[in-house]
Amino acid sequence: MKQQQPYSGYQALIGWVVTERQPGTVTLALELTEHHLNLSDFVHGGVLASLLDTAMSFAGLYSPDPKVVRKAVTLSMTTTFVSPAREGTLTAIGRVRGGGRKTFMSSGEVFDANGNLIAFGEGTFRLRSGSESEGP
């Protein structure tokens, strides 16, 4: 997987990378290691929730100008855990579903390397000052 400059210390800790980014959608990948697992040797739910939160929020932060950095905070999020994962690469996909100038709603899914659904979620996000929507 291609190395990227970390977006934050937390991103560096978890280890996800952006693999695809388009207006309204983003795809992340995470190569699982032992430190992502819980005591049952499955991916910890917090890791899955973090992947969903990041994919869903990043989906609404796209800008065609790479110099424009848009930021948002999570207002609410629901996560449903469907099946366990313990090895391989996870893929998280976030998609914007609606919103306005200051808030947007997204959904997301996490899949294992075999395409099995591991978790899904929905979230509402508020754009930070200076990050308001550039339009449709």
Please place each PLM-identified region on the residue numbering.
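Terminal targeting signals and extreme-terminal segments of soluble enzymes
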Residues: 1-136
